[in-house]
C-alpha cells in the first residue's frame, strides 16, 4: 500500500506577507503575543550527530525547531490551512542520524471516524520546506499516549529505511525515505481489548520503534529492531533480527505494565519506562526496567516504588549518549507537594538513584511567569543533550524546563532549572478583548486563564489574572464607554475560588464578586453595559442572570431562553441583544436586561440549518456583534455568511462576498473613514484567509498569506487604539498580532 506524494510547501518564519487574492491584499508582519508555552509539549528529539539540532512536537500546536543563534524555538507548520487543522497534532518526530538536514513528522490529531487520515511530512532542509505524503493511517496527536514515543524512527545505518508504529493500523515500513509506505504484515500484535472511552483515555497501540545500530553496518539496513506496544498483562516488547521480516516477543519482559518510552544506550542496554496507563490519563502503577540486549537479562531498576497508598507510574527515561550508565527518569501521577512529580538520577545504570527536585532543585520562572501558579506535571519526555551531559530537558503540560548543571546532582549539589519554551506558543484562544483605552489586549484562553497584555512582546507578569485565578476563561467584556470596567467568567483553577472576576482599573487589579447566580455558576458568556453598571452573565447551561451591584445580588432576566449568549449595545447603556439563530429569533432589551422582547430574525436568504459542520463551537461564528460607537448597529456573523443591520436588527443585509466565517471583530477606523475597520476569518470571493475591510464590508483585503495560516483560527479582533493592528486567536498556536508591513 503506497502513500500519495504531495506538493512542496515552503515554511518560513516571521516575514512580511506577499499576497495575491481576488479581493486585494495588504502585506502584514506577524508576531506571537508572548505567553510562552501554554500547552503540552509531548516530545523533544535531539539529533545524535549534529550539535544544536533539535525539534519539539506538541499535541495541537504543530512542531518546532530550535534556533541556536536566536535561542528560541521556531514554528514549522504555520502554513497549514484550516482544512488541514488535523495535521497540527504531531504524533511523532524522527531525525535521520546520518543526515542532519532530514526530519520527518507523523501528523494527525485524532483517530475517530470524523477525522481525516494523517500524513507524513518530509523535509530535507531541517523543516524549512516539507513534502507531504498522505497515508491511510489515523494518528492520535491529541489522544491518550501522545507523550509516548517515538513511534517514527529512521534506521541509523540506512537512512532510506523508516519504521512507523501506529495506534490502530499496525507497523509500517518505508524503504525510500518516507515517499511510500507498506504495512509490515508479519507484525501481528496490533490490537488490544481496551474499554471504550474518550480520546484522552484510549488505547495507544505501538508507542516506540528503536533500531540497534550495532547490529549492522553503514549503508545497509539494521537487522535488529525493537518495537514497544502499549499492552498490559501480555507481551508488549518485540524484536526483529532480520530487519523487520519476522518478529518475536522478547522473553522475560515485565508484562504487568505498559511501556511508555525507551532509550538504547551505547553499550546495548535498553531502558524502558512503564505505567499502568499510557498517560496523561492517570497511572496507578509502573516502573523502570532495563534489558541487557547482549545477554537477554532483565532488571527492575525502579527509582521509587509505587504503592497502593502512593499510586503512580513512570512517564519517561533517558540515557546519556556519552555515558551508558548515566540516566534520568520521570514520574507521572506521583502524589505529593507541588504535584509530587520528580526526576530521578542514576550514574550506575539504575542500581541507585537520587531525586532531582526532591534533592534541592530550584526553578526560574521568569521567562513564563504564569507557570509559577502551576505544579510541574506531564513530564512525558526527558532528554540529555548528546553533546553536553550537564544539559537536560523535560516537557510539561505548559512547555518545559532545562538545566545546564544536571551532573551536579551526582555530587549532591542543587540543580537549577529554567523555562525552555521561548518561541513555543500553544494556547487556545477562547475570547479576545482589545479595549478602547488601556492595555493592548486581554486574552481568555483554555487551561491557563488568560492575561492582560500591556506589552505584547513580553510575557505578562505573574498574578495579573488573579483574584480569582481561572483554568479556562470563556468570556470577557468591557464597558463600551467606560472600558476600565472589565468582567471575565470561567472556572477557577485548583486551589482557587470564584468563577467570575472584575476589574475597575482596566485590568491592573481584580476581585471576585460576592455572590454568583447559583452556587455552581461557571463558564458561559458575559456582557457589560456601555456604562459598566449592568453585567449580564449566562453561566454554562443556566438562565441569563443580571447584576447591577457588581455581583452582590443577581436576578434572572425575563423573556429569554436559558443558555442564550447576550451582548451589550456599545453606546446605549440600557440596551442588550441576543439571538437564537436556528430558531429565527432576535431578543432585545431596553431596560438594562431586566426583560427581553422576542422579534423575528429576518435574514434575506433565510435561516441556516443546524447541524453539519459549522466550524469549532468555541469560535466566533454564529454570533451577533454590536458596532462600537453606533447605537443599534449590528453585525450577524453566521458561519455561512455575514449580515449587517443599522436598525436594531429589524432588517439585515447580506454581504455577498463572504461565504464562510469563523471569527469577526472591529478595529480602529482607517484615516478619514467614518466606520470602524472590520476583521474576519473565513472565505471572501472564494479566497480563504484573514481579511480587513475599511468600508463596512463593501470591499475586503486579505492580510495573511499562505505561510501564516495556523490551522484552526477561532477569534479575531482589531485594536480600537491603532489602525491596522489585528489580533488572531488560534487553536494551539497561541495569539498572534499583525501590523501592516512597513514599505
Q: Which ranges hold each PLM region?
A:
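Hydrophobic alpha-helical membrane-insertion segments, chiefly the h-region
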Residues: 16-20
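Bacterial N-terminal signal peptides that target proteins for export
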Residues: 1-12
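Extracellular glycan-interacting surfaces
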Residues: 11, 21-743
Amino acid at each position: 500500500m503506497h502513500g500519495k506524494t504531495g506538493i512542496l510547501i515552503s515554511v518560513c518564519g516571521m516575514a512580511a506577507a506577499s499576497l495575491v487574492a481576488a479581493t486585494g491584499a495588504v502585506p502584514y508582519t506577524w508576531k506571537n503575543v508572548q505567553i510562552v508555552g501554554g500547552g503540552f509539549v509531548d516530545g523533544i528529539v535531539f539529533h545524535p550527530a549534529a550539535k544544536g539540532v533539535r525539534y519539539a512536537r506538541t499535541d495541537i500546536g504543530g512542531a518546532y525547531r530550535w534556533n541556536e543563534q536566536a535561542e528560541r524555538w521556531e514554528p514549522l507548520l504555520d502554513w497549514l490551512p484550516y482544512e488541514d487543522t488535523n495535521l497540527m497534532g504531531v504524533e511523532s518526530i524522527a531525525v535521520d542520524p546520518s543526515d542532519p538536514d532530514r526530519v520527518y513528522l507523523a501528523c494527525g490529531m485524532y483517530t475517530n471516524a470524523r477525522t481525516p487520515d494523517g500524513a507524513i511530512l518530509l523535509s530535507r532542509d531541517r523543516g524549512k520546506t516539507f513534502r507531504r505524503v498522505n497515508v491511510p493511517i489515523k494518528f492520535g496527536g491529541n489522544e491518550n499516549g501522545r507523550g509516548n514515543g517515538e513511534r517514527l524512527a529512521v534506521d541509523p545505518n540506512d537512512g532510506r529505511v523508516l519504521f512507523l508504529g501506529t495506534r490502530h493500523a499496525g507497523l509500517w515500513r518505508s524503504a525510500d525515505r518516507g515517499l511510500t509506505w507498506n504495512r509490515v504484515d508479519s507484525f501481528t500484535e496490533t490490537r488490544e481489548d481496551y474499554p471504550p472511552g474518550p480520546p484522552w483515555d484510549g488505547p495507544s497501540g505501538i508507542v516506540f520503534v528503536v533500531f540497534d545500530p550495532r547490529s549492522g553496518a553503514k549503508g545497509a539496513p539494521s537487522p535488529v529492531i525493537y518495537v514497544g506496544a502499549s499492552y498490559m498483562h501480555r507481551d508488549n516488547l518485540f524484536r526483529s533480527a532480520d530487519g523487520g521480516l519476522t518478529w518475536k516477543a522478547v522473553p522475560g519482559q515485565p508484562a504487568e505494565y505498559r511501556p511508555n518510552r525507551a532509550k538504547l544506550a551505547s553499550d546495548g542496554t535498553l531502558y524502558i519506562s512503564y505505567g499502568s496507563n499510557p498517560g496523561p490519563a492517570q497511572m496507578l502503577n509502573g516502573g523502570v526496567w532495563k534489558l541487557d540486549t547482549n545477554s537477554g537479562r532483565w532488571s527492575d531498576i525502579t527509582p521509587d516504588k509505587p504503592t497502593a497508598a502512593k499510586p503512580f507510574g513512570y512517564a519517561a527515561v533517558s540515557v546519556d549518549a556519552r555515558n551508558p550508565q548515566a540516566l534520568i527518569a520521570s514520574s507521572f501521577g506521583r502524589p505529593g507537594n507541588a504535584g509530587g512529580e520528580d526526576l530521578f538520577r542514576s550514574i550506575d545504570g539504575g542500581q541507585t538513584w537520587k531525586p532531582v527536585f526532591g534533592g534541592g532543585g530550584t526553578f526560574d520562572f521568569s521567562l513564563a511567569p504564569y507557570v509559577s501558579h502551576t505544579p510541574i506535571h506531564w513530564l512525558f519526555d526527558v532528554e540529555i543533550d548528546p553533546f553536553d551531559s550537564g544539559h537536560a530537558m523535560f516537557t510539561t503540560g505548559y512547555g518545559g524546563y532545562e538545566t545546564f548543571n544536571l551532573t551536579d546532582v551526582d555530587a549532591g549539589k542543587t540543580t537549577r532549572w529554567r523555562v525552555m519554551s521561548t518561541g513555543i506558543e500553544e494556547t487556545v484562544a477562547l475570547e479576545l478583548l482589545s479595549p478602547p483605552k488601556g492595555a493592548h489586549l486581554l486574552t481568555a484562553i483554555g487551561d491557563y486563564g488568560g492575561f492582560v497584555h500591556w506589552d505584547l512582546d513580553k510575557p505578562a507578569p505573574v498574578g495579573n489574572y488573579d483574584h480569582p485565578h481561572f483554568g479556562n476563561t470563556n468570556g470577557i467584556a468591557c464597558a463600551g464607554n467606560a472600558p476600565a470596567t472589565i468582567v471575565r467568567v470561567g472556572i477557577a483553577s485548583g486551589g482557587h475560588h470564584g468563577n467570575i472576576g472584575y476589574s475597575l482599573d482596566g485590568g491592573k487589579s481584580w476581585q471576585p464578586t460576592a455572590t454568583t447566580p447559583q452556587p455552581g455558576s461557571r463558564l458561559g458568556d458575559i456582557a457589560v453595559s456601555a456604562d459598566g453598571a449592568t453585567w449580564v452573565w449566562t453561566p454554562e447551561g443556566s438562565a441569563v442572570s443580571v447584576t447591577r451591584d457588581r455581583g452582590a445580588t443577581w436576578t434572572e432576566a425575563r423573556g429569554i431562553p436559558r443558555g442564550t449568549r447576550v451582548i451589550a449595545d456599545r453606546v446605549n447603556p440600557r440596551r442588550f441583544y441576543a439571538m437564537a439563530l436556528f430558531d429565527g429569533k432576535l431578543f432585545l432589551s431596553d431596560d438594562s436586561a431586566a426583560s427581553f422582547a422576542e422579534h423575528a430574525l429576518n435574514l434575506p436568504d433565510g435561516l441556516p440549518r443546524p447541524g453539519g459542520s459549522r466550524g469549532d463551537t468555541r469560535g466566533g461564528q454564529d454570533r451577533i456583534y454590536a458596532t462600537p460607537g453606533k447605537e443599534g448597529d449590528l453585525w450577524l456573523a453566521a458561519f455561512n455568511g455575514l449580515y449587517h443591520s443599522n436598525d436594531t436588527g429589524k432588517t439585515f443585509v447580506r454581504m455577498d462576498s463572504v461565504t464562510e466565517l469563523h471569527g469577526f471583530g472591529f478595529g480602529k477606523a482607517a484615516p478619514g473613514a467614518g466606520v470602524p475597520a472590520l476583521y474576519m476569518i473565513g472565505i471572501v470571493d472564494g479566497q480563504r484567509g484573514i481579511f480587513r475591510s475599511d468600508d463596512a464590508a463593501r470591499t475586503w483585503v486579505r492580510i495573511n498569506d499562505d505561510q501564516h495560516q495556523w490551522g484552526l483560527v477561532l477569534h479575531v479582533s482589531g485594536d480600537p487604539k491603532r489602525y491596522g493592528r489585528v489580533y488572531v486567536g488560534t487553536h494551539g498556536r497561541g495569539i498572534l498580532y499583525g501590523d501592516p508591513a512597513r514599505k
